[in-house]
């Protein structure tokens, strides 16, 4: 067994119950979040209150922000990467579809400032995909784009080139279970193992290949692996703190990239609560938070338009469940750990905390209904965030919203 060695930099462990969103820590935190949002976020309180109210199922656009806020980060470090990201007002997130010539041309011709794409050459069936040529075309477009590579650093995916035919859960030992949300072929990993990290950080690893193809940075998925129950069990067995190890891991990825490309960006998907740790904040440039207001089910069933509870007080109430459409209610009932059992208020607390520390915020909601889409764009932008909406599978090109 090889585990990444511990260094002099250590963190205060976080209670496991808090990581899982359970127990008295969460209950006591609800009132605290409401108070802190009002007290801490001077200049953002009004917009945050409106966003917490959210769209009602009957009238999603009945409440809209009355003014647009500018994110303020008085203590933020003005790095080249954050300067580049601050210029992004429209972005595309497309990883569930093959990048055929027609799709690439639509992206090239679009007014998007940034696009997040899967690094297709890492897929077993796409090893010859001309990724570098596509990146160059997007850079050279009439409206040039930042091109960011999507990577899953907390799960092994059985369709990637690194996957070996004999691998299964428990062999190698750092593959610890199945995806808890039902995404087939995805397996949470004990990400602190050298064998896993070498796949990414090796001399000919995935990160170097991404940089060689001209990408402008990384979009890190499954940062939340530290909260997966199988990962937690493995961490306890190995005597490590999964939160600490994840921050070490993100810092290692960030250091690798920025030592070779100082203006390349690091965007972390979800896990906004890690913004409480300054060591984590220093390693990333932005957070992209999924389903702040709307979600869809795994495997795109339903594809979206399931509103989250607007406040902590509404979580898991009968009134909230009754307000859902039939497909969304099935999703709610089938997965007690889904985002439909978390409030927009909780997400907004951590996002605004991160924003105050100088982290740029992108939002990813899953909705197609025009009223819901319009409401999210207006609400997210009023908070100083940069929104994007699509299907849960992120499998279609979406035209930019002005």
Residue locations for each model-derived region?
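Glycan-processing catalytic domains of CAZymes
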Residues: 73-402
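Ser/Thr-rich, Proline-interspersed low-complexity disordered segments
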Residues: 48-79
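Short hydrophobic transmembrane-like helices used for membrane targeting/insertion
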Residues: 1-3, 11-12, 36-37, 63-69
